[in-house]
Amino acid sequence: RPDTKIILTEPANSAILASGYINTRNEAHQPTESHPAFEPHPIQGWTPDFIPFVLQEAVDGSYYDELLPVAGPDGISWSRRLAAEEGIFTGISGGSTFAIAMKVAETAPKGSVLLVMLPDTGERYLSTPLFEGIDEEMTDEETAISQSTPSAQMVSG
């Protein structure tokens, strides 16, 4: 589609692309320093403390149309909502991607098509802030629901 737009996103508090600073690299294109704009953030798998060479090439070639920041708590919130409301079990990065998609959808022209990839699963984040405050054991009500479906029973304890 000729009207395709590519939107990049990065953690709002670790805006290394938005900073405009380019990592120095060795002959193998590996970064030789930590990016000065890097800050710790909860979006695991995103934004290490350097710009990967393949990403720098894409930035240099202007292979994207827009760069939008996303706050870590928004990613966590959307990841939880996707699980609870849609049955999509994704990690914080998937929730963060979806948060930006929802932001873009708010102003997209009527009839626009948005393709959003959530190449992640929530399973690997069970011990992270994503699941903070969620009990490990099923409630009596959840156990009853589980037992009402003989082919998919969960045993607690």
Briefly describe each language-model feature range.
Residues T4-K5, S112-L114:
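Residue-level recognition of the N-termini of beta-strands and the immediately preceding loop/turn
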